[in-house]
Each structure stands twice: as C-alpha cells, then as structure tokens.
Amino acid sequence: MTDIQEKLKNYISSELEYWDFSGVIRIVKDSTILYETSRGFASIEFGIQNTMETRFEAASVSKQFTAFAIMLLYDKGLLCLDEKANQYLPDSMQIPADITVHQLLCHTSGPHNNYNFEDDFYVGADRMPYDREQFFRDWILKDAGNLSKKKTRNSFNYNNSNYNLLAWIIETVSGQTYSEFMEEHIFSKLGMTQTAIDDGQRILRNKANNYMHDYGVLVRVPYTNSLYSIGAGALVTNCDDLQKWYECLRTKNLLSERAYQIFLSENTNHYCYGLEWYARNSYLHGGDFLGVSAYTHYFFDENLCILLLSNTESLDQYRLGTGIAAILHNGQAPHYYRPEEHLLAPQDLAKYTGTYLPGKIQIEEKNGKLYLVRVNQNIHIELYCVGKDSFIRRYEEQQTPHRLIPDGGGQPSIWGYKRIREPL
C-alpha cells in the first residue's frame, strides 16, 4: 500500500465510522482503483450489506447524463442550443417564448422551482401517478406570467425544472422515451449494464433502499414517484458503471470534439452542462434527495476521479470529497467533529416549539428532546443545542447551525419562517 493509499484509508475510515456512513466510495487513478470501500446496509430489513456492486439512486448526478444526451442530439443536427426551447417541446407544453435550450442546460431560464417550502409538490403531489402534461401544467408552468416578464435570463438559479424540460425535449426530438434514449445511446454503448432510469415500478435488482432518521431511528424514506425527477434525478447506478462513464468523458467518447468543448465550458456560477467547473480544472456534481447522497468529481488532466454513492444522508459528501481531493494533492483533510452539546431542560426547549409553516415546518419537544418536523410531517429530525439559541441535527452532518432566535431576540424562526403558532 502506497503512502497516499494509507492516508486515504485512515482518513476515510475515520470519517465513515464517525458519521455512520452507509454506501460506497471509490477513488480511481490512471484506471487503477486507489481505494474503495462499502459500508452499511442495502436492506436493513433483510440484513443485506452494501457491496461495491450495489446500485444506488444518484439524485442530481443524473443531470450530467441528461445534458450529455442533449449534446448527442446536437451532434446529430437535431437541435440547436441557442434556439428557443419551445421549438423542441410539444405544442401542449410551451414555456415563455424567449427561453433557449442553452439556458435550461445552465440553469439561467428561471422556471418555477417546485421544490420549495410553500408548494405541495415535495412529498405531496410527487407521490401521485405520473402525468407528464399535468406535471408540466401544475408545477413547471406555475407562475408563468411572472416568468414571462423577465427581461434577462443571465442569473443562475439551480432548478430541477430545467432538466425536467430537457428530458421532455429529448423525448420529443428523438421520438423515444427518456429511458429508452438513455439506454440505447449511452448506457448500452458504454457497457453500463447496472445503470437505468427508475420508473418507480420495474424491479431493479441489487438496488439499495434509502433511509432517514425519524425520532433517532433509521426508517425507510417516504415514497415519492421517481418519474417526477425525470431528467433531473431518477438515475440508478453503481461504482463500476460510474467509472465507465468517467472514462467516456475523459477520452471524449460518443461526442464530437466541438460538442465536448461546449459541454464542458463554464457558464454562470461555474456551471457547465450538468457539471460544475471546480479547482484544478476539475468537474464536479453531487446529488441529494430523501435518504440519498451522491458525489462525482473528475480530474481529467490527472486521470483521477472520486465516486461516492450513499443510501443515507449522514455525512456531507461535498466536505468528504474535498478532503479526499486534498489528500490526493498532498494537502490536509481536516476532520469535522460534532459540536459539544449544551444540555437544556424541557422547559427551556419549549420556547422554540410550535408551527412555522403549516403542514410543512414544525418544531416539537418530546421526552426532553427537540425535533424538527419535515417531509410533509413524516420525519422528525432530532436537533441538539450547540450554543445560545443554536441547534444542529444530531444524526446528519450539519456545519452551519440553525439560529432559532436571532441576535437581539424576537420571534423564533427557521429558514426565514417565523413561528406563527405555539403548541396547544
């Protein structure tokens, strides 16, 4: 074992044990695996452990594949990136006329973001049977009047809706379903036999279940219909296939040189097409969803990549990935420790409890512990005090505490929402 491998092993092992990680990590240099590990369970119910062959949901790591598919259509002369997106969408699914395909790809188009606190989409409407046109009408086109009034579309606003629309462009232009196109033109050509688009129904063998902490105990995440993540998420894959994908990008396979130049060019806010330009001329994209953490970091000039897939949200994959990259480049990778707990009596916790956004955000006290109630009232996330009016999650890494009462006092608030009702 080389010195670098020993450092990677020691650092990653200490991090994963401290944060109770469940998933897989692989680091590849010059097509050789420098380090890999699998931890935790793919199925807690049946005692099935994760292995390096386990398949995981990849959340927003999916976006780089959608963007690549658009570039395949570009290479075939089937679409122009600077043309209006409406030219490639069905007549019944038209968006404000000035939005281009390029703006969708780099998140500067400005459609409605349905993953917000106020809307009833997240763990609400996205649990229903998938209807493409209804989804478009009710959740993508929402606030279209305000959207049409925008004079410029140069500001960055990361939004899954952009990539939902791109998936529908792929379907319209190709005449195939999004899943069929990805399978025929990307997955099968690269031998990615363990990669698929999850339609929420077909059985994907060796796929890990996703878990979250509810009242401090790991539970299955609430059901959502993965088709509502089309283009923006829904990819299921494993480390072997992601390594094949990295090699495709590194060797510039499947696309023309010109298409790769566009695909990897930095736009607003360091965003390319489905990837972010990062330090050392590298490209990165992660993903987060209910019980899902994913991370891909590519150093093409050095023939180096970092891959992480997890079926819990216990650890900050971006911090860990940055630490791994630091070791690979002879730097220091600091360990992040949970801040010391400041014990509070139940009566002291009570001043934070109540409703902050009806049906969406609530804080409750139970058996001397404070819980943030989220995910449509399904998940109770334990918080503990780390300073005056400051709290963090106990079981998931969180580096910036929730400041529940602002400096100078006032009404309790979280994420900008003031408490509107105290508990009865």
Which residue stretches match the model-derived regions?
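Active-site-proximal loop and beta-strand segments within enzyme catalytic domains
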Residues: 21, 29-30, 41-160, 176, ...
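Well-ordered alpha-helical segments within folded domains of soluble proteins
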Residues: 66-67, 162-167, 240-244
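Non-catalytic beta-strand/loop surface segments
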Residues: 203-204, 208, 212
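Solvent-exposed loop/turn segments at secondary-structure junctions
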Residues: 111-112, 163, 312-314
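Secretory-pathway/luminal and periplasmic proteins that interact with or process carbohydrate-rich
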Residues: 34-35, 92-100, 110-117, 189-199, ...
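Short, well-structured active-site flanking segments
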Residues: 34, 65, 71-90, 173-201, ...
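Catalytic loop of the DD-peptidase/beta-lactamase superfamily, centered on the K-T-G motif
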Residues: 1-38, 171, 176, 180-183, ...
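Short coil/turn segments at secondary-structure boundaries
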Residues: 27, 116-121, 153-154, 199-201, ...
